């Protein structure tokens, strides 16, 4: 049965307009993005099938173009649309942060860093640079690879902090495995960067680790 033949209250688009996007299931949200189904499958049925094939919404959103295009009902146009939606979401969160103090909106910071880093297949180390009022000046990914071998040079972090004229910063990196447990190397690097940045009077407010679930704050655990 086509979605058009469903009762209005059960159609994903109508439900979204009436109750908001948060009221929809993953399959219903994906169905709105897909717009149409394929022969023998409505958009919702196709969405359910795709979620089962990929193992959930996150793996689908993080899929490579090659893997994405292998699925019936998907293709280069849909992949491009999806990447545009994801990038707009990142930029929206970045814009929100630029207008607020980090200390007043820690959840927004974590949401932003999660959006920036969670989908990356490799470990990325970056910094969120802040002014004296803890407003965001910018974000930069400074290295790629495991923390042990990522070549995170303190002088590089100091150089970028001075370039932004930052008064403080938040360190961050992701664990592609999904684990949120900081390694011994993570803690060692944090202490090393703290000492290097103290010399130029730049405070390290936190080191956020992005994995499965809510990002972990090393500051909240007393590891800073």
Swiss-Prot record:
GO terms of biological process kind:
proteolysis
**Pfam families, alphabetized:** RadC (PF04002), UPF0758_N (PF20582)
- An annotated Gene Ontology molecular function: metal ion binding
Repeat listed as a keyword: no
> Where does motif JAMM motif map?
173-186
- On the tree of life, the source organism's domain of life is Bacteria
Q: Sorted alphabetically, which keywords does the UniProt record give?
A: Hydrolase, Metal-binding, Metalloprotease, Protease, Zinc
Sequence positions that bind Zn(2+): 173, 175, 186
Output the InterPro entries linked to this UniProt entry: MPN (IPR037518), RadC_JAB (IPR025657), RuvA_2-like (IPR010994), UPF0758 (IPR001405), UPF0758_CS (IPR020891), UPF0758_N (IPR046778)
Domain (MPN) spans 102-224
Family according to the record:
Belongs to the UPF0758 family.
What protein name is recorded for this chain? UPF0758 protein PFLU_5982
């Amino acid at each position: 049965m086509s979605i058009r033949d469903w009762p209005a209250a059960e159609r994903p688009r109508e439900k979204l307009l009436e109750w908001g996007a948060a009221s929809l299931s993953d399959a219903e949200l994906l169905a709105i993005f897909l717009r149409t189904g394929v022969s023998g499958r409505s958009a919702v049925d196709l969405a359910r099938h795709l979620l089962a094939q990929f193992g959930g919404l996150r793996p689908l959103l993080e899929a490579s173009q090659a893997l994405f295009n292998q699925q019936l009902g998907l293709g280069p146009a849909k992949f491009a649309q999806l990447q545009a939606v994801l990038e707009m979401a990142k930029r929206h969160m970045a814009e929100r942060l630029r207008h607020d103090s980090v200390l007043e909106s820690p959840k927004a910071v974590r949401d932003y860093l999660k959006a920036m880093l969670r989908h990356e297949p490799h470990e990325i180390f970056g910094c969120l640079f802040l002014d004296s009022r803890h407003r965001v000046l910018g974000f930069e990914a400074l290295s790629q690879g495991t923390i042990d071998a990522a070549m995170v040079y303190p002088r590089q972090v100091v150089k970028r902090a001075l370039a932004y004229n930052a008064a403080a910063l938040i360190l961050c990196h992701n664990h592609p495995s999904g684990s949120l447990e900081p390694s011994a190397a993570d803690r060692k690097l944090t202490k090393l960067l703290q000492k290097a940045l103290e010399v130029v009077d730049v405070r390290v407010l936190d080191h956020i680790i992005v994995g499965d679930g809510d990002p972990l704050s090393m500051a909240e655990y007393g590891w800073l």
